[in-house]
Amino acid sequence: MTSRRNKNWNRFRCAFLAVLLGGATLGLPAQARVQGSAASPATKEFTDEVGRTVRIAQPVKRIVSLAPSLTETLYALGLQDKLVGDTDYCDYPADAAKKHKVGGAINPNMEEVAALKPDVVLVVKSLNRLETVRALEQLGISVYSTDPHSVKDVIASMKRLSGVLGAQEAGDALVEKLEERLATVHAKLNGVEAKRVMFVVWTEPLQSVGEKTFIADVLKHAGAASVVESKQDWPKFSLEEAVRLQPDYLVFASDHSEGVKNDVDALALKPGWSLMDAVKKRKIAVVSDAINRPGPRIAEAVEELARQLHPEAFGEKN
């Protein structure tokens, strides 16, 4: 693997590692109901997506995001001026990189977060640890958790969050835009046979995504069917097993498509990989890291992958 490729993939794996921590993540059942009763003249009670009752100061003026997808959502809702801090991995849009950094998503610096005096800290159940939430609450900081598992969940979550943050109109407009774009893609793919794909998280060891993950649902919306059938979120398996599955395409998430193609050229020279038809025929789809982030670029990720797997459906040459 090239050094640039390794660096890029390491960024994506940080999100996966939080899931692999198992019981360390938020483990409460998800709910979507928002309660509108006022807890005090200055606060309002909400039920977040893991069923916790959260009191949040109103109107919300200062927000800290502990997930790249949530940072992107805040920008999409026009709330970037209220974003006072985010993580080291919050790099989209470009302006997000200029925000005050509070460390990583898994182990943020609590002192840095507290110093920003946020009205609310936003987290994602599958990414941020329960210990982080508890530590913030002990500091008297409100924490609101999201918990999307599918494309539909992501859209509903963004709409719900817009209401919590006082940007319902912007949320409604964002949701309408995303649903229209997805509907256009679905219409073009109507009647098209799904491609058998393997989403590659890592090559050494070989790692993919399980059938219940958000990414697996993105694949379905893009006219793809994962050849990996696993209840685990991020299953690891042998190269021999991958060769046996013989996917039509290998799908990679990277901002450096040329780097991935060079890596595949190198893989083609290795024993085992050279037996995989997708490698021999260079059936490789490279999409942006938007596919890894359950946020406002989700429709973009679906369309980007769909165009590569089914160019004829979009009037393009294969």
Predicted regions and their residues:
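Bacterial N-terminal signal peptides that target proteins for export
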Residues: 3-16
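Extracytoplasmic substrate-binding proteins
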Residues: 43-46, 52-53, 119-120, 130-207, ...
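Short secondary-structure boundary segments
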Residues: 67, 125-126, 201, 231-234, ...
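Short helices/loops that flank or line small-molecule/ion binding pockets
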Residues: 110-117, 139, 238-246
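Bacterial N-terminal signal peptides
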Residues: 14-27
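His/Asp/Glu-enriched short active-site or ligand-binding loop at hydrolase and phosphoryl-transfer sites
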Residues: 87, 212-235, 254
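A short, structured surface patch at a secondary-structure boundary
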Residues: 43, 61-116, 120-127, 132, ...
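N-terminal hydrophobic or amphipathic helices and topogenic motifs
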Residues: 12, 27-61
